[in-house]
UniProtKB/Swiss-Prot annotation:
Gene3D superfamilies: 30s Ribosomal Protein S14, Chain N. It is found in: Mitochondrion. The keyword Ribonucleoprotein applies. The gene is RPS14. Pfam families: Ribosomal_S14. Keywords: Mitochondrion, Ribonucleoprotein, Ribosomal protein. One of its GO terms (biological process) is translation. It comes from Bigelowiella natans. Belongs to the universal ribosomal protein uS14 family. This is Small ribosomal subunit protein uS14m. GO terms for molecular function: structural constituent of ribosome. One of its GO terms (cellular component) is ribosome.
Amino acid sequence: SLRLALICPGLLPIRNICVATSRSRGVFRKYKLSRIMLRDMGLQGLLPGFKKR
């Protein structure tokens, strides 16, 4: 579908989807992760710069 989106840009809407879980709601665009995965990976120390407040 990415190839089709490049050929006809107005044909398919670009959805923000989590790359880990394919969840479409609560996705942070900068990280392409859902809020749940962002929290889990941050607590595990997999994301540099994330810390618990």
